[in-house]
């Protein structure tokens, strides 16, 4: 077992928004209130027309300038001299926003496995509460990949009057059976750990083996065959451990020190519920209703959200444009080749100016 040290994870510049109003959740649950951890960069202009919302992935947080650092800087995708960039920790996470590790004010103890089921739409609703508290009613561009990309798409479907333009990356319009099966295998790995205790473990002490195993499984889908072959092949260390084994073990150990098992389960279940068509006329109609400018980034080597899923989005979203990132890094390419991704975002921003 290991203890989490949130002090080393959450930036000192993190701000917090709190709402004491009950939050009604899509699947019928309710939270008595919500706290949102967020960060901003740059200055909101007088017209409030320079807002960029960055949506993070599964184990990310509000510190976008850390996990997506190559996207920040003058002349880059997120330019603090021109843009007002906002990134918040999603509902259900463990980096400052209300989630399973939060104390339930009604019981006086951590929510743990009692945290209600949430969806991507609930995450977007909480982000909207935050932005409205900042006096923002229009977002120039919403950007995100993976779980972040799901939020981007739901922003367009839920609040088209606020969403000026969308750039979802490495994502589908509805979670596939392939992705759902991957998520469930990872959740079962956590549940198989004796320290899991049906989710009622000490919130400061992790079911280490299960969460690490879940992360190791996930890392096999975040990269790809070619990446593992080129990077590790059949190389072995002096102790006989294959380098590929050493790599995934290291990734598992790293996550255990910075994440929470109940949070992992909460967020992967929310991802499994991702479906733009749920409760709407149809999947096709929901995508067809997205009238704002949309650029979709597809990663050629992504085995988790393969190219055909982004091609489907492009086919169903009117006037959308499909871009390809041809890199041998797998799903995580959006985090690795930030030079190319930043350039693509900059080109989209320039096109938005021309079109306006």
UniProtKB/Swiss-Prot annotation:
GO cellular component assignments: cytoplasm
Family to which the UniProt record says this protein belongs: Belongs to the AB hydrolase superfamily. MetX family.
Record-annotated active site: 146 (nucleophile), 302, 331
Gene name of the encoded protein: metXA
Amino-acid positions noted as binding substrate in the UniProt annotation, renumbered to this chain: 215, 332
Protein keywords: Acyltransferase, Amino-acid biosynthesis, Cytoplasm, Methionine biosynthesis, Transferase
NCBIfam families from the UniProt entry: homoserO_Ac_trn, PRK00175.1
An MF annotation (GO) of this entry: homoserine O-acetyltransferase activity
Biological or metabolic pathway of the protein: Amino-acid biosynthesis; L-methionine biosynthesis via de novo pathway; O-acetyl-L-homoserine from L-homoserine: step 1/1
Highest taxon of the lineage: Bacteria
Function field: Transfers an acetyl group from acetyl-CoA to L-homoserine, forming acetyl-L-homoserine.
Subunit organization: Homodimer.
InterPro entries assigned to the protein according to its UniProt record, in alphabetical order: AB_hydrolase_1 (IPR000073), AB_hydrolase_fold (IPR029058), HAT_MetX-like (IPR008220)
UniProt-annotated location(s): Cytoplasm
Catalytic activity: L-homoserine + acetyl-CoA = O-acetyl-L-homoserine + CoA
Protein name: Homoserine O-acetyltransferase
């Amino acid at each position: 077992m290991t203890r989490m040290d949130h002090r080393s994870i959450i930036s000192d510049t993190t701000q917090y928004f709190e709402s004491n109003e009950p939050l009604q959740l899509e699947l019928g649950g309710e939270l008595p209130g919500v706290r949102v951890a967020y960060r901003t960069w740059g200055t909101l202009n007088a017209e409030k027309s320079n807002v960029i919302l960055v949506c993070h992935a599964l184990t990310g947080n509000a510190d976008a300038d850390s996990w997506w650092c190559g996207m920040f800087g003058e002349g880059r995708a997120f330019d603090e001299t021109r843009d007002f960039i906002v990134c918040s920790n999603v509902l259900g996470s463990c980096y400052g926003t209300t989630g399973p590790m939060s104390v339930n004010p009604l019981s006086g103890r951590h929510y743990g496995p009692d945290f209600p089921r949430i969806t991507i739409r609930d995450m977007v609703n909480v982000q909207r509460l935050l932005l409205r508290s900042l006096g923002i009613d229009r977002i120039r561009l919403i950007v995100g990949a993976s779980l972040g990309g799901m939020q981007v798409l739901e922003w367009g479907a839920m609040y088209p009057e606020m969403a000026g333009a969308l750039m979802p990356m490495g994502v589908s319009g509805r979670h596939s059976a392939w992705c759902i099966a991957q998520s469930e295998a990872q959740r079962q790995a956590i549940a198989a750990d004796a320290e899991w205790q049906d989710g009622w473990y000490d919130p400061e002490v992790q079911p280490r083996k299960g969460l690490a195993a879940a992360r190791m499984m996930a890392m096999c889908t975040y990269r790809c065959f070619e990446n593992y072959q080129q990077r590790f092949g059949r190389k072995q260390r002096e102790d006989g451990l294959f380098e590929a084994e050493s790599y995934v073990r290291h990734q598992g150990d790293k996550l255990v020190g910075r994440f929470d098992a109940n949070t992992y389960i909460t967020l992967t279940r929310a991802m499994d519920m991702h479906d733009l068509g749920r409760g709407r006329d149809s999947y096709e109609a929901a995508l067809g209703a997205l009238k704002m400018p949309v650029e979709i980034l597809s990663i050629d080597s992504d085995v988790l959200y393969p190219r055909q899923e982004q091609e489907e989005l492009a086919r169903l979203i009117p006037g959308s444009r499909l871009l390809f990132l041809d890199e041998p890094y797998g799903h995580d390419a959006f985090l690795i080749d930030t030079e190319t991704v930043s350039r693509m975002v900059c080109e989209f921003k320039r096109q938005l100016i021309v079109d306006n």
